[in-house]
């Protein structure tokens, strides 16, 4: 490589172990970056919740895990909610590890959308950086992002200009779009396959709209994703004729792309500001048109 290799500590989301699907798009973003950075010769240490599985094609990657209680997700909290860290929470345990490992590293890179690592940044000896993974969902998060921007906005990057526009920043944002290894996706050109939908099964993803489309057409909708809100999933299923939804669960990329590639279209129906529509890119990489709003 043209520049000397760096010692980097990457910190995963505290919402579920890496490989569980609970972290949503953050998992795909993180694993893609792990592969890309390792391929460029950087020395990578990954800090993640207990049970996490690192990509098997990242030679030399060191995995350190921490246990503890799950961290609540900000997108399901009230907008005016206070910062919450459970007793024996995995989030502070992850950051105890990260700050210790980061003392001799060139940088510690945070992938979680959480108040604690953002607040720690001006106070830590390690050089902390953040890839902000969501738009505005909380006043507390808006405030800490704005405070960090005033202190040193170079410590943060965003996925898109639209996402960054949600926040009060002091200068134009740094944008890091997601990269995809297209060799991991097989192009399939099917004109008569089923309809598909993929994402976390939660209200902000708008599955009910895609289900209504499938019901109106008298077709089955293939649904991939972790059921994050079981009550919501049941209400969506109850609103359409029996058999409309074919639940496929969370699938790792190599399985998802095989099944998704058989569809004639992917319906994409988010009801919030998606920071980056990973599944839209994945569908197109498989040759599947996307119908979205």
Can you name each region flagged by the protein language model?
Residues 1-293:
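Catalytic cores of nucleotide-sugar-dependent glycosyltransferases that transfer UDP/GDP/TDP-activated
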């Amino acid at each position: 490589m043209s520049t000397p290799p760096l010692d980097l500590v990457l910190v995963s989301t505290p919402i579920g172990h890496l490989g569980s699907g609970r972290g949503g798009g953050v998992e795909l973003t993180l694993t893609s970056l792990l592969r890309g950075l390792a391929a460029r010769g950087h020395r990578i240490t990954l800090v993640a919740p207990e049970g996490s599985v690192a990509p098997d094609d990242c030679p030399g990657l060191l995995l350190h895990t921490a246990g503890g209680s799950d961290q609540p997700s900000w997108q399901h909290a009230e907008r005016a909610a206070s910062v919450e860290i459970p007793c024996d929470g995995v989030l502070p345990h992850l950051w105890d590890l990260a700050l210790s490992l980061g003392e001799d590293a060139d940088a510690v890179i945070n992938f979680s959308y959480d108040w604690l690592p953002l607040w720690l940044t001006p106070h830590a000896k390690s050089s902390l950086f953040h890839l902000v993974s969501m738009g505005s969902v909380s006043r507390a998060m808006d405030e800490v992002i704005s405070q960090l921007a005033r202190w040193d906005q170079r410590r943060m990057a965003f996925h898109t200009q639209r996402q960054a526009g949600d926040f009060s920043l002091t200068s134009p944002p740094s944008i890091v779009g997601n990269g995809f290894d297209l060799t991991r996706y097989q192009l399939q050109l099917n004109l008569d396959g089923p309809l598909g939908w993929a994402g976390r099964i939660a209200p902000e993803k708008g599955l009910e709209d895609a289900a209504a489309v499938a019901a109106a057409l008298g077709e089955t909708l293939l649904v991939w994703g972790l059921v994050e809100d079981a009550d919501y999933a049941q209400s969506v299923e109850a609103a359409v004729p029996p058999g409309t939804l074919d639940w496929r669960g969370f699938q790792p990329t190599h399985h998802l792309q095989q099944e998704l590639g058989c569809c004639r279209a992917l319906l994409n129906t988010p009801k919030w500001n998606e920071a980056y529509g990973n599944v839209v890119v994945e569908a197109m990489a498989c040759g599947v048109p996307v119908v979205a709003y």
